């Protein structure tokens, strides 16, 4: 009897283990299922080290700065936590097919968009350069979808951030060291991430080769996933059953049909004569009784036009001094914009101006032209830098002196230099149709194009880049 009891207990233990294995295999392998097993793989542990190191330092300094920078940092932190959850999922599950993979990546993608949108909604922020540095580089979180070279993609995003972090350094290096430390902490996130990818995910996110296939998101620790929609509606009723008939019925029907066809013209003898009182077109009473009868296809009718799309809300035009920043925004078809009474510590930010002309008198610290079209800018003296970004067909004229003009992501830019600004440095990137006009003794200008095409060669020790001369 004791042997029988021991045998039953052993069988119960075996069944329990089998049920546990079965439950683990059927688990819906999403973010939420991974939380309890975090840190079981080396690359999840390494990512945790990144979160505890540069990310924690970035969050700490952002909190000290406060305001928009702190809010932005919290959004970035959410994106990194979503990425960690995906890494845990990948360490336990096999990679799903295309559509299912998109579902898994959707929360990260939406969080990236939220970070970018925050910057666009706060263009008037005093910490706009901080927000821009984050917004331009947050796309680096998308490395999980990049193959076979996710590392270089992150580096490219890091380089994009440096365009704005350099501004932060220039503005705060002698004013507040906290902002300098913020730049170092933020950029170190992406440099550390590059090293992490190189070690664990060189050719793309490393998925498990065993375990269940990862499915759509469900059960995020913070609540329902951002990317999941409402449950699908219940399926409709099944189609009515197709009437069935026996083989003998089909055979009989076919035989009857062929018999009628073989009758030839004699088949018309079975037709009944239709008298005039039975014809609709000859019997008005019958026509009124039966209503409109249409034979043949419906006549062509033009499709209804789509409802007009709502017109985008037009932002109000601005020309105002906010603190130490002149804001010139959303000006259209205005040819006499003027900024006077400037001070050395003031800056000018010109955004989304179209077919307009602005003159800035006096000496100012810096000027930024962002997302403008057909803008004419005339200024006296700038002690820092004039930057033209994301613009098209811009003309800039220097009346006094400026040390540096930067042209970035711009198509069509004419720079008219004065005699006092001939030593100006012109830095360009990702731009085209740039021309510098040099004054002559007669008061005219000679036009010189800025090179756009380059040739790079390996000389045995390093890459050597030269301007490509095109004979015309």
Curated annotation (Swiss-Prot):
Modified residues (N6-acetyllysine): 81
Cystine pairs: none
Residues where Phosphoserine is found: 34, 290, 295, 301
Phosphotyrosine PTM positions: 31
Compositionally skewed regions (Pro residues) per UniProt: 229-243
A GO term, aspect molecular function: actin binding
Annotated keywords: Acetylation, Actin-binding, Cell membrane, Isopeptide bond, Membrane, Methylation, Phosphoprotein, Ubl conjugation
A matching Pfam family: CAP_C
Membrane topology per record: Peripheral membrane protein
GO terms classed as biological process: actin filament organization; cAMP-mediated signaling; cell morphogenesis
Residue location of crosslink Glycyl lysine isopeptide (Lys-Gly) (interchain with G-Cter in SUMO1): 345
Low complexity composition-biased segments: 218-228, 244-253
Domain C-CAP/cofactor C-like: 307-450
N6-methyllysine sites (modified residues): 287
Modified residues (N-acetylalanine): 2
Keyword Phosphoprotein carried by entry: yes
Stretches the record annotates as Disordered: 216-253, 290-312
Any single Gene Ontology cellular-component annotation: plasma membrane
Subunit architecture: Homodimer. Binds actin monomers.
Family, per entry: Belongs to the CAP family.
Function: Directly regulates filament dynamics and has been implicated in a number of complex developmental and morphological processes, including mRNA localization and the establishment of cell polarity.
Full protein name: Adenylyl cyclase-associated protein 1
Phylogenetic placement of the source organism: Eukaryota, Metazoa, Chordata, Craniata, Vertebrata
Gene: CAP1
